[in-house]
Amino acid sequence: MRAAEERKGVVPAARRRDQFPVGMRVLAVDDDPVCLKVLETLLLRCQYHVTTTNQAAIALKMLRENRDMFDLVISDVHMPDMDGFKLLELVGLEMDLPVIMLSVNGETKTVLKGITHGACDYLLKPVRIEELRNIWQHVIRRKFSTRDRANLDFYEECNKPPNADSDHVHGHVTCGSPDQSGRPSKKRKEYCSEEEDEGEVNTQDIDDPSAPKKPRVVWSVELHRKFVAAVNQLGIDKAVPKRILELMNVEKLTRENVASHLQKYRLYLKRLSAVASQQVSIVAALGGRDPFLHMGGFEGLQGYQAFTSSAALSSFTPHGLLNSPRNNPAALGTQGVPASKSIQTMSGSHTLSHSINDANKYHLSLPGNQKGNLGQGLAASLGQTQMQQKWIHEETDDLSTILSGNGLSNGMSGTLQSVTSSPLLPQELAECTQAKIVSQPSIRTSSVSSEHIEGAVGVSSGLLESRVSQQSTIPLSGFSANGLLIHGSFNNTCANKLGGTSSSCAPARSSNDLMVARDTKGGASSFGGAMLLPPDTEQKYLNFGGGNGLKQKFDDRTADSLFDPKFVWSSVPSSQLASNIGAHHAMSQRWNNSSSNSSNIGARMIGQATSSGSTVIPQMKTDFLVSGDMAMPKNASDLSIPKLQSELSSSSCSFDGLLNSIVKVEKDDVTFSDDLGCGDFYSLGACI
């Protein structure tokens, strides 16, 4: 009878404690009957009480029905009905019993998985009896660890500060704390000893697996939201579990649950604060700035101070951003200029529309020994510390662009640098026209159209003001050999009413060549032109009549009379002309008739001037030489210009800043003579 009871594990608890580890109750689970029999035999030799089963589900059922019948569980890892790791998790959560895993797989990954899932040991098959004789240590270790956790919780509760909870404000003291005289209080010692005795009793109750456990509280999203609302209402510093519990008003929620969650919530807030402080410290150490607080509006770039970086700008490659006419319908560059300072601006085909009344000043200043940076503007040797920029967007009948710079005479020599060695324009336009201008304190140009002109005009540092559009940009066309070539020069009595493509170049000084590129597209009756006016005369310029007016005038005259233009130049003293200028300006214009009766006229103007600051414009005479490979149009109506292209470029075609200007629009009507061969240019200060 006694042996049967011992075999079934119904031995009294007092007797088991006296003979421990003899009589320790072990549950063995393995699907292999041979291994299970060997394991049972070895456990019996160690004087353990063994219960065996070959299914994990049956073992779990036995544990749930009789929690106090077993002290240890030995389970195989690989079983058909249930994985050994799954059984390990369920036993650890429900019974809190030590579980030893047994398997033939001794890989580190598998062993680590078993330990992380809560296994107290991992044995390899075939198991040895020496290993089974010491498995009782896990049972003792688990009991003492449970008791230590209970004592630790009680110690923390006993030594809790009085101001941590409202329940401890009155009458609760720290165990063993000295009184006012510095001696430990006897009453407090007695109180703590009584609490320890109660803790031992509670520990014995905890050791009993049959004792019911407290229900676990799952903090759902809604429950946590109520908790956070209560904490925010009370304040994180004044929030105590009792007050939070009253505000939450949730059933089956105890003060201990709220206290534990409050502690975790405070740790979470501290961690967030530490991360934020670390980020701020890193930003401060690296010298960073808030990317949003210091941003200015796109429209308001007033007071923009130039960077003073000493690093030179890198040159653009031939296939770079400014290499294609599509991406760069207009460019401004220099050639053969000293490489001491470099200026470079970005010109694209994006649409930028601004009011003509919006004038933004860019304060640009660079030391003489430093080089300009990308997007920085003009170099310091231009003598300009301010630059006003206005973007003109006229949708009706006029697109006028005026370049006015009062700092061109302050020393434009040797300040621009070519940033590329490859041409921006196609190979056909590799031979660019070049002209030399005298530094003028004021230069103004205008481009008038009867219809909406769409184009892209790029200038250094945003000096040229026009509408930049990506809707329709015209690729630059070159000079073909079969085109109608017209060669001529200007004088002060000639006026040119030709519409089409014109190219001209102007340098900052006589030793350097300046290139300006411009590409503009107009409608079938649109016309565009640019001219420069000196300050010594009336600052008016030709207003090309667009649309039906110009075409109607062309219809009434022959083409022969068209090629006899007349430009009226401002009167200039002959002494200045003789002393300062000996120049010959030639215009090369080309007609290229296409299937849509469109015409492209190329104009080439070459001028020479001295490097002095004279504002005198040389007299120029215009003569035309028509090649015989194409017949002259009989009717002037064939000369209607559907598109206007104007390029100002050079062989190197670098994209640098040239003019530091203020935009101003002036227009004036033009009176044509009876023979349509004369027009009035009131004054021309420089040639572009």
Curated annotation (Swiss-Prot):
Q: How is it modified after translation?
A: Two-component system major event consists of a His-to-Asp phosphorelay between a sensor histidine kinase (HK) and a response regulator (RR). In plants, the His-to-Asp phosphorelay involves an additional intermediate named Histidine-containing phosphotransfer protein (HPt). This multistep phosphorelay consists of a His-Asp-His-Asp sequential transfer of a phosphate group between first a His and an Asp of the HK protein, followed by the transfer to a conserved His of the HPt protein and finally the transfer to an Asp in the receiver domain of the RR protein.
Q: Please give the residue positions where the record annotates the modification 4-aspartylphosphate.
A: 76
Q: Which UniProt keywords apply?
A: Activator, Cytokinin signaling pathway, DNA-binding, Nucleus, Phosphoprotein, Transcription, Transcription regulation, Two-component regulatory system
Where DNA binds (residue ranges)? 211-270
Report the protein's function.
Answer: Transcriptional activator that binds specific DNA sequence. Functions as a response regulator involved in His-to-Asp phosphorelay signal transduction system. Phosphorylation of the Asp residue in the receiver domain activates the ability of the protein to promote the transcription of target genes. May directly activate some type-A response regulators in response to cytokinins.
Q: Which family does it belong to?
A: Belongs to the ARR family. Type-B subfamily.
The protein's name: Two-component response regulator ORR23
User: Native species of this protein?
Assistant: Oryza sativa subsp. indica
Q: Please state the gene responsible for encoding this protein.
A: RR23
